[in-house]
């Protein structure tokens, strides 16, 4: 891309040189024409004024073309400098254009990291050398153009003064011819002296007015040059503001994309957090279930059975509930499930102290109920 900009600079350089040669040729032709006009009479000078006007129009057109080409050259040169800065991140350049045409421009190397590849560094140095050559040539070109314009302006002022002096002399001769009489020599002498004094006064007044006009013209020319410089600065600032606006637009797009990405990450983070909480809750439920089945289930059931047995004993003592000793094995099974070891010890002692009417079948049924209760406890003691 930098090579493309350098090629564009070479094309603009050739065009500017051609226009400068044409401008110099017109300036030299006008200078030689003025020297020839000095040797001719006033009538011949008036006859050649038409050619001078055409050359002046051509000169102004060339000046306008050169100004547009200079602006294009400056823009392309700035683009090449910016492109070099983007192409080589280790390099940072800053072009300082001189506010005056007689002061050289400056190209500051703000940052340069020499710790890079040798081939890349050599290419960078070569392109930087080309850019420096174009910067120096651009300064010399502007200086040459300003010098030609200043000489042209001086020649125009001198030519205007010369035309004015010739016109004054021509009218003075006509005035002498018209008012020449046939009076005596003394009257002619006095009249010629009076005419000479009048002519001198007229010349002095005319020169004074001319000087004032020249001074005003110089002020206007300086104002025009200053306006041109201000316009150039405004164009440069406009280009800079346009580039800054483009960069801010790119930054805004990047910030919007970043904000969208942050929102997506936040939503994903909330979802992951919710999943983690659900996983922890499920883990706590599983641990609680294992603790209940392995540790807390039997003590809780035993405590409830003892509590119910205690209140049942109180109710039986108070006579509110009747005790049925001859209940079936199916009704005694829940109590035998909880205190199977106690029944195992009490059955041997009760076998000797049982009433005479207890039969062997009742004892066997109780043992079967105890065995079934123990088997039920063992079979249900799992997750």
UniProtKB/Swiss-Prot annotation:
Subunit structure comment from the entry: Component of a SNARE complex consisting of UFE1, USE1, SEC20 and SEC22 or YKT6. Interacts with TIP20 through its cytoplasmic domain.
GO biological process, any: protein transport
Membrane-crossing residue ranges in chain numbering: 276-292
Note: Present with 4910 molecules/cell in log phase SD medium.
Posttranslational mods: O-glycosylated, but not N-glycosylated.
Homology family: Belongs to the SEC20 family.
Lumenal topological segments: 293-383
Protein name in the entry: Protein transport protein SEC20
Organism: Saccharomyces cerevisiae (strain ATCC 204508 / S288c)
Keywords, comma-separated and alphabetical: Coiled coil, Endoplasmic reticulum, ER-Golgi transport, Glycoprotein, Membrane, Protein transport, Transmembrane, Transmembrane helix, Transport
Placement of sequence motif Prevents secretion from ER: 380-383
Described purpose of this protein according to its UniProt entry: SNARE required for targeting and fusion of Golgi-derived retrograde transport vesicles with the ER.
